[in-house]
From Swiss-Prot:
Organism: Archaeoglobus fulgidus (strain ATCC 49558 / DSM 4304 / JCM 9628 / NBRC 100126 / VC-16)
GO molecular function terms attached to this record: mRNA binding; translation initiation factor activity
Transmembrane residue ranges: none
InterPro entries cross-referenced by the UniProt entry: DENR/SUI1_TIF, SUI1, SUI1_arc, SUI1_arc_bac, SUI1_dom_sf
The organism's place on the tree of life at top rank: Archaea
Record-level GO BP terms: formation of translation preinitiation complex; regulation of translation; translation reinitiation
Protein's UniProt keywords contain Protein biosynthesis: yes
Pfam families: SUI1
Protein name (Swiss-Prot/TrEMBL): Protein translation factor SUI1 homolog
Protein family membership: Belongs to the SUI1 family.
Length: 101
């Protein structure tokens, strides 16, 4: 028997909560500087209650071949990956009109 979604009450394989959550997110992707002048890509605006940030960060890190972390609801990736991150988020189902770079 499949698990039940706690939000909508439907079985997990029929649940559309995460897809709806992806469409409603307003995401900002920007770059910043860290110690020793290293660049990082910062992704903010994703609701950590609706989308698993750790899982999304792991996906992005593997696709971009870089390190990164999740701190205070913000994903930080080592290096400047603004355009590639936007493409990957669109592939994952996020609304391209609600992603600001």
């Amino acid at each position: 028997m499949s698990e039940i979604c706690p939000v909508c009450g439907l079985p997990k394989d029929l649940c559309v909560c995460e897809e709806v959550a992806k469409e409603q997110q307003f995401i900002v992707i920007k770059t910043g500087k860290r110690r020793y002048g290293k660049e990082v890509t910062i992704i903010e605006g994703i609701d950590k209650g609706e989308i698993n940030l750790e899982e999304l960060a792991k996906y992005l890190k593997s696709k971009l071949a870089c390190g990164g972390t999740v701190k205070n609801g913000v994903i930080e990736l080592q290096g400047n990956h603004v355009n590639r991150v936007k493409e990957l988020l669109i592939k994952k189902g996020f609304n391209p009109e609600r992603i600001k770079t």
